């Protein structure tokens, strides 16, 4: 077996979460492979394990002693930390209590390891911290330590970081979890299981090879921290490769849908546009990811024979693998099974053989993409007959393997972070679907190729100009070298490839013969068929390049730090007043549940996911404090009166965490993104961290919205006065009362929605009805706002033109308010035209986001958000016009920057907008490129924020982005109210922080006379 296969094998048997050791690093560091244990040591270990398991199963009265002996056997003998019993390297609990005690500042508890591996040559420097637990303690389940609610795994992370020791090992006897907790980076968790050590000896070999005593005393470059660091450079490559794998699967699914459409004379998808088709394919992949995660976490019916055999996604891949390959292409029952499972999850199952509560959600709604079931638009899944598409089992197997396998390893969705899933799937947001106007060939291109497609007509035409011109065209489109193209053009074509090409051409021999000279240049599908798209076919192409527009996925290490830093002064009494940490007071659960936190450029929801986790932990702590004072907490998270008959909060800590996360997600989180697919991905991310058994999906439609965060009104009086800079003395229009009344009614409806508790699908449906009523009430107002912003865009700062346009719009609005539906249609058309100003033909119109209309309860009642976090797009000031148009840049300058000109990066306008969207006591924490503190970007962004009275209380300037994006960033934390606590730059206390993110006052340039 090759070294790569050896490492791939044991890695597939270990549960891994977060970045781990890369195979290239393992093969380079261990060229001889893994060390083989002596037969004596293996027998002794097996005997000790069997004795421990027997004592555990029989509840032996000496279990505690046997448990300690078993753990000591592994640490002292197998890993050889204390083989001679002298205790030079492995220090016991009493020593650790004296020498490795640490007060965790954020939790206010004293911690120390149970054991520690130390280097006695370096003043007993700790190399590995160890925690041991009783056999019944799950290492990833939440438990309570002295009022601190955490998991054993997270407890070890905090201890490692507080003591400056990267590595930790924790065990309950069965599971042995290694923790790598580098400061400022993502934590890695990897778990070995003792029961596998005899069944799969290679896992024991890897465990001993990586954690044996010799690994801690070899050259520093071969120690575990160095190996983890060396593996990081492969992490992006692995994630990108997995993302590409999923992208290919989406392509195959769309090609299958296209073929089904061709077989039905293009009637199936005749009313489905390209965007819908791509969204449907992506929805299928997102459904599969959710179901795999839910099944692995035991939240569906995995284990039930009926479910496993007929519905489960986790078992389907292996069932299909057992079918002969020739049958996979000729059977279609797997696609029907997927559709049945999607329906079961959405609508529930009530049968004597199978019971599954309805989970609902727009993601699984069968009527959202009815063509997936062979139904027409407008049909009803409960009434109309479905005719499942002839998508063969081979295609379904490919879909499943793309998300379940990577480099031969089975991916564990229980171990994968939601952020990792988001990172993979966010790459899909850059793709779209287009129809081929004529026969189009897809070239086997390099990764750098921007447009690897060429029409057959183009090839025929350029061929007439000679071979050199043909080669030049193919080189330009594919990115391949000239020599490779020459070789491919002259290469012989075997009969099997000609036959596959004929099948691709649907038996058209003339078409085959025209394409044949180029066949070696074409990319093939996963089964070796050249990719040829007939006229009218759907092609997956690159759409908006999110990275070119400055959009980058935020690594977990950054989201964790920014969320904690921004939310801490919001959730505790003390940080803003400068009170010592030990005297801070956590706010009550009712106060925490009224907080409103927003990410105005949420992407796949990384910041919202971390906010949900962090704030839920604080909420559980708040409940615990309330109960310790004798109070009772309802299952809805509120403190109960003495005579209340409401259901109490469960005692189980894990159940509390889930309840807390669901409450935070439904009541506290808000998000916006310009890309509708990103909004759906953000919903998926939050659903994945709020999964609860027998509970439906949380209702998120009202709080996660689609639109342009910078384009639109942020105050309702901007609309009632038709002015982007309204004043208290400003003149309201005659229609202002109707607008304000509509907003007030929407607020009442959304407040009712927020108070609802989700028990089953009927509660979700009721919330959906309330949300729809609020949407209907604001429909006309939103249309007026769109038209108004459209006129502001088109005027490009010309006050006279804008005044004339708004005078005419005011007359139309008055007629609409009086019930003139024709005028309403005219206003809609007017808005569409204005919002498409300067956009190229075929490009979707701009989508304004009107904050007081989308989130009316936030701005009508509270005056803004309590907190804003996020990673706005990194787009240079010189690129804004090219990417978004002259009128858009003029809009930014005139409405957001209040007329201040300069080549400011786009992020400066996000900073100004964030500050404006906060309530008077709010905070924001945002990431920006380091130019946020330089030149025009600083003057237009941070300078204007500070002039408004806000304060920068913490900054981390000039940080290299921990990923592929070649940027240097700064994270900036701002308080809109007074800040009476210390200020910090890169962790160092300073007297003040200027807009240059230094402690020196800014020197402003003055023009010489």
Role assignments for model-derived ranges:
Residues 60-106, 136-139, 228-286, 290-292, ...:
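Class I S-adenosyl-L-methionine
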Residues 1-9, 107-110, 132-141, 146, ...:
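Signature of N6-adenine DNA methyltransferases within the class I
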Residues 115, 176-178, 540:
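Short beta-strand motif preference
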Residues 1-166, 184, 227-231, 240:
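A short, conserved, highly charged catalytic patch centered on acidic carboxylates
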Residues 123-124, 350, 534, 680, ...:
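Short loop/turn segments at connectors of secondary-structure elements within structured domains
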Residues 11-37, 42, 281, 292-294, ...:
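S-adenosyl-L-methionine-dependent nucleic acid methyltransferase catalytic domains
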Residues 202-219, 245, 249-504, 552, ...:
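Nucleic-acid modification enzymes, centered on SAM-dependent nucleic-acid methyltransferases
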Residues 111, 126, 167, 412, ...:
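Core residues of folded domains in eukaryotic genome-function proteins
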């Amino acid at each position: 077996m090759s070294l790569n296969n050896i490492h791939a094998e044991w890695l597939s048997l270990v549960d891994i979460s977060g970045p781990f050791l890369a195979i290239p690093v393992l093969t380079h560091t261990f060229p001889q492979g893994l060390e083989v244990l002596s037969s004596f040591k293996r027998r002794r270990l097996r005997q000790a394990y069997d004795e421990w398991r027997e004592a555990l199963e029989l509840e032996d009265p000496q279990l505690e002693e046997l448990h300690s002996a078993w753990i000591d056997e592994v640490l002292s003998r197998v890993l050889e930390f204390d083989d001679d019993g002298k205790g030079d390297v492995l220090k016991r609990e009493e020593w650790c209590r004296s020498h490795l005690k640490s007060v965790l500042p954020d939790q206010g508890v004293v911690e120390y390891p149970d054991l520690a591996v130390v280097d006695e040559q370096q003043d007993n420097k700790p190399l590995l911290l160890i925690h041991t637990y009783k056999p019944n303690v799950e290492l990833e389940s939440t438990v309570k330590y002295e009022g601190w609610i955490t998991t054993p795994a997270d407890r070890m992370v905090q201890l490692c970081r507080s003591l400056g020791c990267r590595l930790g090992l924790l065990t309950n006897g069965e599971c042995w979890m290694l923790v790598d907790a580098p400061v400022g980076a993502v934590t890695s968790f990897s778990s070995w299981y003792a029961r596998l050590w005899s069944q799969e000896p290679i896992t024991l070999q890897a465990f001993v090879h990586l954690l044996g005593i010799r690994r801690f005393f070899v050259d520093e470059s071969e120690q575990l921290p160095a190996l983890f660091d060396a593996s990081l450079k492969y992490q992006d490559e692995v994630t990108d490769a997995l993302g590409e794998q999923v992208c290919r699967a989406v392509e195959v699914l769309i090609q299958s849908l296209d073929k089904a459409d061709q077989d039905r004379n293009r009637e199936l998808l005749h009313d489905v546009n390209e965007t819908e088709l791509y969204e449907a394919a992506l929805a299928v992949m997102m459904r599969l990811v959710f179901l795999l995660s839910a099944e692995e976490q035991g939240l569906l019916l995995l284990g039930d024979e009926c479910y496993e055999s007929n519905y489960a996604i986790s078992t389907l891949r292996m069932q299909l693998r057992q079918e002969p390959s020739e049958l996979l292409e000729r059977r279609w029952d797997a696609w029907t099974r997927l559709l049945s499972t999607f329906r079961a999850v959405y609508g529930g199952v009530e049968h004597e053989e199978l019971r599954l509560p309805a989970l609902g959600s727009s993601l699984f709604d069968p009527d959202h993409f009815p063509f997936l079931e062979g139904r027409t638009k407008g049909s009803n899944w409960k009434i109309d007959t479905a005719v499942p598409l002839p998508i063969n089992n081979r295609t379904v197997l490919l879909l499943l393997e793309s998300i379940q396998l990577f480099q031969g390893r089975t991916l564990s969705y229980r171990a994968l972070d939601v952020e990792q899933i988001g990172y993979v799937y966010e790459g899909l947001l850059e793709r779209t679907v287009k129809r081929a106007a004529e026969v189009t060939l897809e070239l086997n291109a390099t990764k750098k190729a921007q447009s690897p497609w060429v029409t057959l007509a183009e090839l025929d035409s350029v061929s007439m100009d000679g071979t050199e011109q043909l080669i030049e065209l193919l080189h330009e489109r594919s990115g391949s070298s000239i020599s490779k193209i020459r070789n491919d053009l002259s290469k012989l074509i075997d009969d099997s490839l000609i036959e596959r090409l004929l099948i691709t051409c649907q038996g058209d021999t003339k078409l085959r013969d025209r394409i044949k000279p180029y066949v070696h240049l074409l990319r093939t599908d996963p089964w070796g068929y050249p990719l040829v798209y007939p006229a009218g076919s759907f092609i997956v192409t690159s759409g908006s390049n999110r990275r070119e527009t400055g959009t980058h996925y935020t690594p977990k290490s950054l989201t964790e730090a920014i969320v904690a830093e921004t939310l801490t002064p919001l959730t505790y009494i003390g940080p803003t007043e400068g009170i010592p940490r030990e005297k801070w007071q956590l706010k009550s659960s009712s106060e925490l549940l009224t907080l409103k936190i927003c990410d105005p450029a949420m992407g796949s929801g990384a910041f919202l996911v971390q906010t949900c986790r962090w704030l839920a932990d604080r909420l559980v702590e708040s409940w615990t404090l309330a109960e310790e004072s004798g109070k009772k907490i309802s299952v809805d998270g509120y403190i109960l009166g003495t005579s209340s008959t409401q259901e109490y909060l469960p005692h189980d800590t894990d159940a509390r965490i889930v309840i807390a996360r669901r409450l935070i997600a439904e009541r506290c989180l808000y998000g916006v993104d310009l890309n509708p697919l990103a909004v759906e991905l953000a919903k998926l991310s939050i659903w994945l961290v709020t999964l609860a058994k027998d509970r439906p999906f949380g209702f998120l439609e009202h709080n996660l919205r689609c639109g342009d965060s910078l384009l639109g009104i942020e105050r309702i009086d901007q609309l009632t006065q038709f002015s982007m800079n309204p004043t208290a003395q400003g003149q309201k229009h005659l229609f202002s009362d109707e607008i304000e009344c509509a907003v007030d009614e929407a607020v009442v409806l959304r407040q009712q929605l927020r108070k609802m508790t989700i028990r089953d699908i009927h509660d979700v449906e009721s919330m959906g009805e309330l949300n729809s009523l609020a949407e209907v009430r604001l429909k006309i107002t939103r249309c007026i706002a769109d038209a108004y912003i459209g006129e502001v865009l088109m005027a490009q700062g010309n006050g006279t033109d804008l005044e004339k346009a708004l005078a005419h719009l005011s007359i139309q609005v008055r007629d609409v308010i009086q019930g003139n539906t024709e005028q309403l249609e005219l206003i809609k058309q007017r808005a569409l035209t204005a919002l498409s100003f300067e956009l190229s033909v075929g490009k979707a119109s701009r989508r304004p986001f009107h904050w007081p209309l989308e989130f009316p309860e936030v701005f009508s009642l509270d005056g803004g958000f309590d907190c804003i976090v996020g990673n706005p797009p990194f787009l240079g000031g010189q690129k804004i016009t090219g990417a978004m148009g002259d009128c858009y840049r003029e809009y930014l300058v005139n409405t957001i920057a209040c007329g201040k000109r300069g080549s400011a990066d786009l992020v400066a306008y996000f900073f100004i907008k964030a500050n404006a969207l906060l309530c008077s006591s709010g905070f924001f924490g945002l990431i920006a490129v380091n130019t946020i503190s330089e030149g025009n970007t600083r003057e237009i962004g941070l300078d204007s924020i500070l002039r408004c009275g806000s304060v920068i209380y913490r900054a981390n300037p000039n940080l290299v982005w921990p990923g592929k994006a070649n940027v240097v960033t700064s994270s900036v934390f701002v308080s809109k109210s007074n800040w009476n606590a210390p200020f910090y730059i890169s962790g160092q206390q300073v007297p003040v922080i200027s807009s240059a993110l230094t402690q020196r006052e800014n020197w402003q340039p003055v023009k010489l006379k």
